[in-house]
Structures are given as structure tokens and as C-alpha cells.
Amino acid sequence: MLILLNTFAELPEAYKAFAPTVDVLPLIPLFFFLLVFVWQAAVGFK
């Protein structure tokens, strides 16, 4: 099972150049979550 997961954990050779971008992609939803608090702070948590 671990070998199967490791197979999916690595990008195919053709996509190795995009590895830095793929590493950042999971953080994008967190930025939106933080944006909600910044937005609400700007409007006074109405």
C-alpha cells in the first residue's frame, strides 16, 4: 500500500518543472480563509 501511495506522490517526469507550483497549490485555500478575516476586519465584522 505504501508503495502505491509513493507512486502517486511523485510527479511524472513531464511535469517535474511544475513541482514548485504544485507545492504551493494546497496553500491557496488557506489564503482565501485568511482573506475572509481581513475583509471582515476591514468592514468591522458586521
From Swiss-Prot:
Description of how the protein assembles with itself and partners: PSII is composed of 1 copy each of membrane proteins PsbA, PsbB, PsbC, PsbD, PsbE, PsbF, PsbH, PsbI, PsbJ, PsbK, PsbL, PsbM, PsbT, PsbX, PsbY, Psb30/Ycf12, peripheral proteins PsbO, CyanoQ (PsbQ), PsbU, PsbV and a large number of cofactors. It forms dimeric complexes.
Species annotation: Prochlorococcus marinus (strain MIT 9215)
Cellular compartment(s): Cellular thylakoid membrane
Function text: One of the components of the core complex of photosystem II (PSII). PSII is a light-driven water:plastoquinone oxidoreductase that uses light energy to abstract electrons from H(2)O, generating O(2) and a proton gradient subsequently used for ATP formation. It consists of a core antenna complex that captures photons, and an electron transfer chain that converts photonic excitation into a charge separation.
Any matching Pfam family: PsbK
Family: Belongs to the PsbK family.
UniProt keyword Thylakoid present: yes
Chain ranges passing through the membrane: 25-45
SUPFAM superfamilies: Photosystem II reaction center protein K, PsbK
Official protein name in the record: Photosystem II reaction center protein K
GO cellular component assignments: photosystem II reaction center; plasma membrane-derived thylakoid membrane
Membrane topology of the entry: Single-pass membrane protein
Prodomain positions: 1-9
GO-annotated biological processes: photosynthesis
InterPro entries assigned to the protein according to its UniProt record, in alphabetical order: PSII_PsbK, PSII_PsbK_sf
The entry's keywords: Membrane, Photosynthesis, Photosystem II, Reaction center, Thylakoid, Transmembrane, Transmembrane helix
